[in-house]
Amino acid sequence: GNLDQEIQKILLTVDVTQAVVDEAINLKADLILAHHPFLLKGVNSIQEQSSKGSVVSKLIKHDIALFSAHTNADVQLNGTSVEIAKRLGLRSLRPLIQTPVGYGIGVVGETDLSMLELAAALDVNIPQTATGIRGTGDFDDVLKKVAICAGAGDSYLQEALDSGADLYITSDLRHHPALEIMEQAKARGINFNLLDIPHWAAEYVWLERAKSDLESTGLEIEICDIRTDVFNFLINLPP
């Protein structure tokens, strides 16, 4: 966008899609503030007939600026993971990966909740999705320390285990990394478990925090009501 453009209305969203841009146009928003980068991977063309090109064209034609927060929102003190931790009532929060000290990806905090109590609290504090929450462990397990990385976090499975956490909450867990860390925990005699929550839902809660923070500027702030979670049904038949 134009750095000199005057901003009066901001639309907050997790992802930038054609439908989200259409909503921004209808709302007469001046800026879309997204969590995920629009061009997460490079493109060779932005012709209007392509999905990316269509979005770029609409943004330019309607003078709508676009800003993507992503890891800037992940590492801040009121970032994506911290927002989930606060909603779960975790105490003594610290970054999972500190760079620099005091800031970083993910969060680790203390709790006295059981696995069932924490999973239930998580379920009511993130948007409902078709795929829901997947987990390992026993509902009666009493937790002491929980690690969280909002968004795709299986690259930090080792750090979560080494942090002393009983439970790691993240998204997009793949079979092999998850299985390997669980086997490693068993070999070390550690009761370590996982909760896999929907990626979109995990980061949507940050939009509500961002709205609250930005409203102090006097600007008009809207949260996009378009669900960009990819999945819309789940088949889970009994064996």
Regions found by a protein language model. Give the residues of each.
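Hydrophobic structural segments
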Residues: 1-239
